[in-house]
Amino acid sequence: MERRRIIETKHEYFSPYNRFETVAIDLKWLPLSKDEKLEHEVFIVQFDPESSSSLHKHKGYEEFYVIDGELIDDDGKVFRKGDYVKFEKGTKHSSYSKTGCTLLVILYAGTNELNG
């Protein structure tokens, strides 16, 4: 019995980022894995140049690896290709990419979009 799943991401369609009420057309994503019971999900997200994520709060941890490009967090911290970042439970933030970037994201317990 096969107990693995292989996703050849270069052949997959990245759809507009629709995890929140508002669809972010300048962010694209490819869901890779999700466990509803454990509230755990893994996905790849691509930021177009000059795009940003909405302000959101993490109900659990968020971890991501910068595959390519640069991401700037709302406090000015720059994350570059090869960086691995972990946000603690309860973190509120938004991010921006001037040049575009690709991230491998791991979420625990999801996020809530915040207004302003």
Which functions belong to the PLM regions below?
Residues 1-39:
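A short, N-terminal "cap"/entry segment at the start of jelly-roll beta-barrel domains
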Residues 28-58, 72, 88-92:
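Conserved short histidine dyad/triad with adjacent acidic residue
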Residues 40-42, 64, 101-102:
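Structural motif
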Residues 57-59, 77-78, 97-99:
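Short glycine/proline-enriched turns and hinge-like loops at secondary-structure junctions
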Residues 58-74:
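Glycine- and acidic-residue-biased ligand/ion/polar-headgroup-sensing regions
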Residues 89-113:
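Ligand-binding loop in jelly-roll beta-barrel domains
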